[in-house]
Amino acid sequence: MSSRKTAGRRATTKKRAQRATSNVFAMFDQAQIAEFKEAFNMIDQNRDGFVEKEDLHDMLASLGKNPTDDYLDGMMNEAPGPINFTMFLTLFGERLQGTDPEDVIKNAFGCFDEENMGVLPEDRLRELLTTMGDRFTDEDVDEMYREAPIKNGLFDYLEFTRILKHGAKDKDEQ
């Protein structure tokens, strides 16, 4: 009986991992997705639809490597949950797309958030983006603001970072 409960919990956890990253398929064309699927299937040694520590070990061993448990744990801990194909795409997508880690993005915005509230005045952020560093045009800022979480003139950079890294929430999750 406990094995059914455990299996049910595992399936629920796996389902959540997939839903949280479902927008990742828009990052790649069909040919790229097919290549990633082939690579995923090569790593998923036991063919259960998930890459687990043992799968990584077996795959690396087949390449003549002898990875330590710490090394494998480090690889597994890069994912916030079980590594199904969607999560696999997300992990590689972030590396291929060259986006910064979530905390780096939050900290960059946070440098200008003197009250540490997680928001910046919309007009102040526009001024910063158009006058400092790699300057944005007003059109660039307008485009960013079109989908940005702005309420009462405040840009929610914590939510913006979440959207940037994980995609917008599905309508049924809001």
Curated annotation (Swiss-Prot):
List residues, modification Phosphothreonine: T21
Which Pfam families is this protein grouped with?
EF-hand_7
Q: Which SUPFAM superfamilies match?
A: EF-hand
GO BP: actin filament-based movement; apical constriction; apical constriction involved in gastrulation; border follicle cell migration; cell elongation involved in imaginal disc-derived wing morphogenesis; compartment boundary maintenance; formation of a compartment boundary; imaginal disc-derived wing hair organization
Question: According to the lineage, what is the superkingdom?
Answer: Eukaryota
The record places domain EF-hand at 31-66, 100-135
Phenotype on disruption: Mitotic defects including failure in cytokinesis.
Q: Which UniProt keywords apply?
A: Calcium, Metal-binding, Motor protein, Myosin, Phosphoprotein, Repeat
Q: Please tell me where Ca(2+) binds in this chain.
A: D44, N46, D48, D55
Q: Anything further noted?
A: This chain binds calcium.
Q: What is this protein called?
A: Myosin regulatory light chain sqh
Originating species: Drosophila melanogaster
Q: What taxonomic lineage is listed for the species of origin? A: Eukaryota, Metazoa, Ecdysozoa, Arthropoda, Hexapoda
Q: Which gene does this sequence derive from?
A: sqh
